[in-house]
Amino acid sequence: MKRFLLVLSALLAALSLPAATPAADPIDELLPVRGLAIQAPQRSQMNDFLKFVEGELVSAHFNLLILRVDWGYAYASHPELRDPDPLTREDVQRIVAVCRNRGIRLVPQINLLGHQSWAKQTHALLREYPEFDENPSVKTENYTDWPNPEGLYCKSYCPLHPEVHEVVFDVVDELCDVFGADAFHAGMDEVFYLGEKECPRCNGRDKAELFAGEVTLIRNHLAEKGRQLMIWGDRLLDGRTTGLGEWEASYNYTWRAIDLIPKDVFICDWHYERADLTGVYFATKGLPVATCGYRNPTVCEQQIRDMVRFRKQSAPETAARLQGYIHTVWSGFGPFLRRYQAAKGENERDEAHWNDAQALRTVIETFTNLAQ
């Protein structure tokens, strides 16, 4: 009996101990976020896309995938906004299943506020709802090249139009639901048209307040369902003071919005020609941030190593906001895959469009080395 009681006591003591947790991957401490932002595949590319995720991203320790869907989904809430041959619910569920199985956080993106057109093409929202246009007198069919007298790069919707968010939030909610997403990327980069004189609602208003108001409205809507907002960071940087210019930063005074937006908005801080060190600026402003690279392999590797160094050399509060690195691809998935295969020697190399694929190869190698 005495021996039985001793064994029982030992067993109870063992059961009271906290469960052992698996050892964390070393790269999780060095670089918590390791992402890719890319256009969603066309339906005919689904098998190749899933093979790419499983064969390339998983083994390289990627844990975030941002998919630019825009109007390429078969929206039930607003069928008029569908692009031709859009992804179906079943297509998206296949992507969700692979990412969930492999521990990859999947985040859908629709460009909000800006990027409502490209060159001569007006995208679905303003095509179907022209009353939402911030400056309707500027016609995309008259686009020639940049720069141009009308300052047309991409159209914007009016953030103060009383009906725009009813439509926008319908499709955002539908997309987040089908993706099972706990975050949404709203784009919001390169917004040149904002607070325009011809807009009866925005004319004369502070552009920083307009931008911050739209960010906050979207963020608050997402937060109601426990979702986080992600945006590109360029409009929150002063292009003149930093010397970053009007693309990677702002010339139209939206940069002051950095002090007006909620502190849980995730900033994707993109720089493609140099490894500019603005990630620390966002972190010291209280915002979570990841550095984003594109087509220069040397710059991309430096951005990753800088982020690792920043995290090591910062106070814990700041280091926690320096989240990691997100690689970007700015073409359709099909053309990119051909370039990527060429960069691996699997296809004929396209010299004119090779660097973005080689940059991803460099990122994969850097992630892999950090994980060892």
Locate predicted features.
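Histidine-centered catalytic/metal-binding microenvironments
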Residues: Q372
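Catalytic-core regions of glycoside hydrolase
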Residues: N63, V178, D182, Y193, ...
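N-terminal hydrophobic targeting/anchoring segments and the immediately downstream early-domain regions
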Residues: A20-G55, S59-A60, L64, N135-K139, ...
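Bacterial N-terminal signal peptides
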Residues: V7-S16
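Aromatic-lined carbohydrate-binding surfaces of glycoside hydrolases
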Residues: A37-Y251, A257-D259, V265
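Flexible loop residues that form catalytic
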Residues: S9, P41, D70, Y272, ...
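Positively charged n-region of N-terminal signal peptides that target proteins for export
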Residues: M1-F4, P18
